[in-house]
């Protein structure tokens, strides 16, 4: 209990008494105007500091005394209201939006614009057989059992299935014979012996 009482005021003093970071040390992100960089005001990395930022163009807000009283010497500015015509905001696309692009409708124009791929003569491709890939389903007969791979797989699968069935039947017969012989002894003696619980009185 004593260590907790000692650490509680110290913890409160550390967390509550001291601010984590003083306000003066926190800097805001500076915004650099790219136009100033293009005009050549800053050379070889001499970018403005926090104090220099805004020194070129002072707003009228900086000219006040700070007492809270505003100078009423400026005339209020009034802007004429411009009424824009109402434009409907829909997604309708007019038919003649792009007059340069049109679909040809005459058969002559269609024939002129048609692209016909070049055909390779059939006698050129007969000599080079290395590019042709034989499809396994079309290269041989349509009957699946005529293929040697399928027949070999069926024979091996059948043999494995028959062997599995024979071993399963043999296991069942063996268990049934073992049960009939009475090899299962229901009156087994326990492996451990319980210690006597005799009480001795002194």
Curated annotation (Swiss-Prot):
InterPro entries: Neurexin-like, Syndecan, Syndecan/Neurexin_dom, Syndecan_CS. It is a single-pass type I membrane protein. Glycans are attached at residues 44, 65, 67. The chain crosses the membrane at residues 150-174. Pfam families: Syndecan. GO terms for molecular function: fibronectin binding; identical protein binding; protein kinase C binding; thrombospondin receptor activity. It is found in: Membrane; Secreted. Residues 175-202 are cytoplasmic. GO terms for cellular component: cell surface; costamere; extracellular region; focal adhesion; plasma membrane. Keywords: Glycoprotein, Heparan sulfate, Membrane, Proteoglycan, Secreted, Signal, Transmembrane, Transmembrane helix. Residues 105-121 have a biased composition (Basic and acidic residues). Residues 1-23 form the signal peptide. Its main location: membrane. Residues 24-149 are extracellular. Belongs to the syndecan proteoglycan family. Homodimer. Interacts with CDCP1 and SDCBP. Interacts (via its cytoplasmic domain) with GIPC (via its PDZ domain). Interacts (via its cytoplasmic domain) with NUDT16L1. Interacts with DNM2; this interaction is markedly enhanced at focal ahesion site upon induction of focal adhesions and stress-fiber formation. Cell surface proteoglycan which regulates exosome biogenesis in concert with SDCBP and PDCD6IP. This is Syndecan-4. It comes from Rattus norvegicus (Rat). The lineage of its organism: Eukaryota, Metazoa, Chordata, Craniata, Vertebrata.
């Amino acid at each position: 209990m004593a260590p907790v009482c000692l650490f509680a005021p110290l913890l409160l003093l550390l967390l509550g008494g001291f601010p984590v970071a003083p306000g003066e040390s926190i800097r805001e992100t500076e915004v650099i105007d790219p136009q100033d960089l293009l005009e050549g005001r800053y050379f070889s990395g001499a970018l403005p500091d926090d104090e220099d930022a805004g020194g070129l163009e002072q707003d009228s807000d900086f000219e006040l005394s700070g007492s809270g009283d505003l100078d009423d010497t400026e005339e209020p500015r009034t802007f004429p209201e411009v009424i824009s015509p109402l434009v409907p905001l829909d997604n309708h696309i007019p038919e003649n939006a792009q007059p340069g692009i049109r679909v040809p409708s005459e058969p002559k124009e269609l024939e002129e614009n048609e692209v016909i791929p070049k055909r390779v003569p059939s006698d050129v491709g007969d000599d080079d057989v290395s590019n042709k890939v034989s499809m396994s389903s079309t290269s041989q007969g349509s009957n699946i059992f005529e293929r040697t791979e399928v027949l070999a797989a069926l024979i091996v699968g059948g043999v494995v299935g028959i062997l599995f069935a024979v071993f399963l039947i043999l296991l069942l017969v063996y268990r049934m014979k073992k049960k009939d012989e009475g090899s299962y002894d229901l009156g087994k003696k326990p492996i451990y012996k319980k210690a006597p619980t005799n009480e001795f009185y002194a």
